[in-house]
Each structure stands twice: as structure tokens, then as C-alpha cells.
A protein has these predicted regions:
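Bacterial Sec-dependent N-terminal signal peptides
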Residues: 1-31
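Flexible, low-complexity junctional segments that flank or bridge functional domains
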Residues: 23-219, 224-235, 248
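Active-site neighborhood of thiol-dependent amide/isopeptide-bond enzymes
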Residues: 191, 251-260
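Short, well-structured beta-strand/strand-turn elements
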Residues: 185, 258, 271-279
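Short, conserved helix/loop micro-motifs enriched in His/Cys and acidic residues
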Residues: 240-252
């Protein structure tokens, strides 16, 4: 097997583990092991990295019936030392695709291996044309990734397309000033692919006047599927500004919400004045 592809597969698999949420982090011994520079060796390297570092095997078994040991046996039958690099890559992509996890991807010069069935197998539940109709042409661009306006029925409409960029405190202050007389706010995060957790937290912190426990995190502590730390609270603190919103809020979601957009949704769900609508 081409050494460059072999190195790329192993390194990217390790990088994938580093890119998982903090609850999935564990610096174990897998990356220091030596595997033969063959299709079988690379197959076992990737399977083992996943086996010892991935956090959600019990959940995937319960909800999808995924048995990771059975997956190894089934896909190992397709691995032989005369496989081409491309064929090996495609098999490895199918193997990790069994998990149906949008954060689990493998890339190479041939393609970007992914499983997006969590979105593509379901209705979009979103119309950009309808969103544009409500925004109109005289909307305000608050910053990179979000725009807003006050609708005719005195409801604020905030479209957050991305959390890729930081949300300036000054710009958020201006936005909430502009919508101060509104009876409520609709926050539309449909098809928001995520971005920075700090950006989503900055926005969410404007909707509470007290510290709120929004979720719990445990950390991967070893190679076993159930090697986790105790639970730690994740708390949302109110923004250190007078401009906070305590009137009703509706957050619109769909399956296009991903990563930090999901974080924003479940954080907002913990607040008393917020209603989530969508899937």
C-alpha cells in the first residue's frame, strides 16, 4: 500500500479523535502502536482507534443495532493484501459509515468519506425562499452569519446561518435595542452547520438572568467502551450586560442544524422562556 495513503489514513483517524467534543477525548496508547503497512494493517489500525476512542458505541448499539465487533468481522472479510488504495479507502469509509455519525469522516485524495443520511434521508423541513420572504430586503446584517428584522406583527425575526464567526457584544447590544419593543423573538437556526461554541454561547447567554445547568459531560478515560469519568455540569451564565431578553423565544430547528448549532438548541431548551420547534 502506498505509504502516503497509509500515513494519511492513520493520521486523519487520530485527528478525527482530536476533533470530537471534549467528552470524547482520551490520549491513550493506540497512536503509538505499529501496524503493518498493508491493507490489513491499516484496517486494524483504524478499527482499533475507533474501538478505543469513540464514545457512543452503547448508544449506537441501542438505537441502530451496531455491534462494532461484528462490524470488524464483516468488513475484514473484504480486506486482502492485493487491494488498491482506493478500494481500501472505500471499504474503510463504509465501515465507519455504519455509525451514521456526521462527525466521523475519512478523507483522501480520492474523496471525502462521509455519512450524511441523518439529513439526506429525511425531508428538508426548510425553505430558503420562505425565509427570504420573511426577511425581506430591508433586514439588518448584525454580523457575519446572522441577520434580523422586526416583522409587521411586532415579532423579532433573527436568522442565524452560521456560528463560524464570533458574535460581537456591541452588535448584539444594538440588535436587542432594535428589538426591545417586540413581544417575542423567533430565532431561525435551520440549516446552520455550526461553528464556534463561544459564538453560540454568547447568543444564548442573552436569554437568561441566572446561571442555568444546560447539560452534563463525561470524559473518555480509557480504551473500554464504558471507560468514562463522572458527570460534570455545563452551566450557562447570563451575559454581563443589561441587554438580556426574558420575553418569549421560539427557536426553529431542522436536521440541517449541526455541531455548535445543536449545542445552541439544547442550551436554549433548558431556558424557561424558550420553545423549540422542528426536528
Amino acid at each position: 500500500m502506498n505509504r502516503n495513503l497509509r500515513n494519511r489514513i492513520c493520521v486523519l483517524a487520530a485527528l478525527f479523535m482530536m476533533l470530537l467534543p471534549a467528552g470524547c477525548s482520551w490520549n491513550g496508547e493506540t497512536r503509538s502502536r505499529e501496524y503493518a503497512n498493508t491493507p490489513k494493517g491499516n484496517f486494524m489500525a483504524l478499527w482499533t482507534i475507533m474501538d478505543e476512542h469513540y464514545c457512543f458505541f452503547d448508544f449506537k448499539k441501542e438505537t441502530l443495532g451496531v455491534d462494532w465487533d461484528e462490524v470488524k468481522v464483516r468488513y475484514a472479510a473484504s480486506i486482502s493484501d492485493d487491494l488498491s488504495d482506493r478500494s481500501l479507502f472505500e471499504i474503510l469509509c463504509k465501515m465507519i459509515g455504519e455509525l451514521r455519525d456526521g462527525h466521523v469522516n475519512l478523507t483522501s485524495q480520492y474523496d471525502y468519506g462521509r455519512n450524511w443520511s441523518w439529513k439526506t434521508d429525511h425531508p428538508a423541513n426548510f425553505s430558503k425562499d420562505l425565509q427570504d420572504k420573511y426577511l425581506g430586503t430591508d433586514y439588518i446584517i448584525g454580523g457575519n452569519g446572522y441577520s434580523y428584522r422586526v416583522l409587521d406583527d411586532n415579532i423579532g425575526y433573527l436568522v442565524v446561518e452560521s456560528f463560524e464567526s464570533a458574535m460581537s457584544d456591541n452588535r448584539l447590544n444594538i440588535m436587542f435595542n432594535n428589538m426591545a419593543l417586540c413581544n417575542g423573538i423567533i430565532i431561525d437556526i435551520r440549516d446552520n452547520g455550526g461553528g464556534q461554541l463561544t459564538a453560540s454561547e454568547s447568543l444564548a447567554s442573552r436569554f437568561t438572568e441566572k446561571k442555568v445547568t444546560v447539560s452534563y459531560t463525561c470524559y473518555k478515560t480509557g480504551p473500554g467502551h464504558n471507560d468514562f469519568s463522572k458527570l460534570y455540569k455545563n452551566e450557562l451564565s447570563p451575559a454581563e450586560y443589561d441587554l438580556r431578553w426574558i420575553k418569549p423565544v421560539v427557536v426553529l430547528t431542522n436536521r440541517g442544524c449541526f455541531s455548535s448549532a445543536n449545542d445552541f438548541a439544547f442550551t436554549m431548551k433548558a431556558l424557561d422562556n424558550v420553545t423549540l420547534m422542528g426536528d
